[in-house]
Regions:
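MIDAS-like acidic motif and immediate structural context at the N-terminus
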Residues: 1-20, 91
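Short beta-strand-loop
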Residues: 9, 32-62, 68, 74-79, ...
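An active-site-proximal "capping" alpha-helix that borders the catalytic cofactor pocket
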Residues: 14-29, 38-39
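Arginine/glycine-rich "motif VI" loop of SF2 helicases in the C-terminal RecA-like domain
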Residues: 26-33, 77-78, 124-131
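Generic beta-strand/beta-sheet core signal
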Residues: 39-42, 89-90, 136, 162
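Von Willebrand factor A/integrin I-like adhesion domains
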Residues: 53-55, 132-184
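VWA/integrin I-like adhesion module and closely mimicked acidic/polar interface patches used
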Residues: 58-63, 92-154
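Structural motif
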Residues: 85-87
Length: 184
């Protein structure tokens, strides 16, 4: 829910919420034995109740992907489930990081090497914990696409590339089957 979701006159937040609401409905109705937690990440990360998703608003300016993944990992490890996965809906650019002393390091200029390194370290922690990260990417910037490819490759997850105009169609990169296909 970072501010980047509404930058440059393009609302990526509303489509992201639509995807999250649809996934929530699917899981609650078709996979009733599964549990679902929602984590919003911006300058930091927070868990929100399922009922609060529809009313969620764009938050602070930066995207602390590492903190969002860390919180999601903690929530998943607290549950006694065989299959653990994170479904991340993002516009892709990690631009903030929580430092060991609690301060937030922010850099919105390009992909900051330190933020990227620490974010990928958290992705690796997810993999070590047996957590797959599947990503819905709502942007087409090549650097961000490459970042999402790295996340998916590390965790053997899937990456779905779309935009706000073609949310019903997306490009699926399946890192388990090593295939790419267009889905409508």
């Amino acid at each position: 829910c970072s501010h980047s979701m509404i930058l440059y006159g393009e609302d990526r937040f509303t489509p992201a919420k639509k995807v999250a609401l649809a996934l929530t409905h699917l899981i609650q109705t078709q996979f009733a034995g599964d549990s679902l937690k929602l984590v919003l990440f911006h300058d930091s990360a927070e868990e929100i109740p399922l009922g609060a998703l529809a009313g969620a608003q764009v938050g602070p300016y930066h995207t602390n992907t590492a903190e969002g993944l860390k919180l999601a990992r903690r929530l998943l490890l607290a549950q006694k489930k065989d299959m653990r996965q994170i479904v991340m809906i993002t516009d892709g650019k990690p631009s903030a990081l929580t430092m060991p002393d609690g301060r937030i390091y922010k850099n919105a200029m390009g992909l900051d090497a330190y933020v990227l390194q620490q974010t990928l370290a958290e992705v690796t922690e997810c993999r070590r914990a047996g957590i797959v990260v599947n990503t819905f990417m709502l942007a087409r910037d090549q650097a961000l696409v490459e970042f999402v490819k790295m996340v998916s490759s590390i965790t053997r997850g899937r990456a779905y590339f779309t935009n706000t105009m073609t949310l019903g169609q997306y490009i699926l990169m399946d890192f388990l089957k090593r295939k790419t296909r267009k889905v409508s």
